[in-house]
A protein has these predicted regions:
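Long amphipathic alpha-helical segments
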Residues: 1-84
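Conserved mid-sequence domains
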Residues: 86-136
Length: 136
């Protein structure tokens, strides 16, 4: 999907509006949210991580790209919501000392899209809080 390269380019330029334009064009072409998450957002963020690891971009650039990706997810979330509900629940979040929450956020969104009731706890959640979450 060449859109992932275009999306990545806009991420690295810090152009949130252009990133959202890429996503909206894909939605208009009836590309599924799941495919956008997998083949555009995930793929682009993996490349951002590789660039940072290789010293080709700064921490600030990586954080900006992540921030833009999260804002795109926030806009896409409204398209994920469904009236279909099933009798299943999930508590989703990152383990202690894990601050990279975009991947689990996408998983959470897809569970919701499939009718699950999801409690997304975000980054760096103590294990005891998962066990004791009370979201039963």
């Amino acid at each position: 999907m060449t859109e992932s390269k275009e999306f990545l380019s806009y991420l690295l330029k810090g152009d949130r509006v252009a990133c959202m334009d890429v996503v909206n064009q894909l939605l208009d072409a009836t590309v599924s949210v799941e495919d956008i998450y997998e083949y555009v957002i995930r793929k682009s963020l993996y490349e951002v991580g590789d660039l940072w690891e290789a010293g080709k971009i700064t921490v600030a650039s990586e954080h900006l790209a992540s921030s833009i990706a999260e804002s795109v997810l926030n806009e896409l979330y409204l398209k994920v919501l469904t009236d279909v509900k099933i009798e299943k629940k999930a508590v989703i979040g990152c383990v202690p000392n894990e601050y990279h929450q975009i991947g689990v956020r996408m998983v959470s969104d897809i569970f919701e899209k499939n009718g699950w009731t999801v409690f997304f706890l975000g980054a760096n959640v103590p294990v005891s809080d998962f066990i004791d979450s009370g979201f039963r």
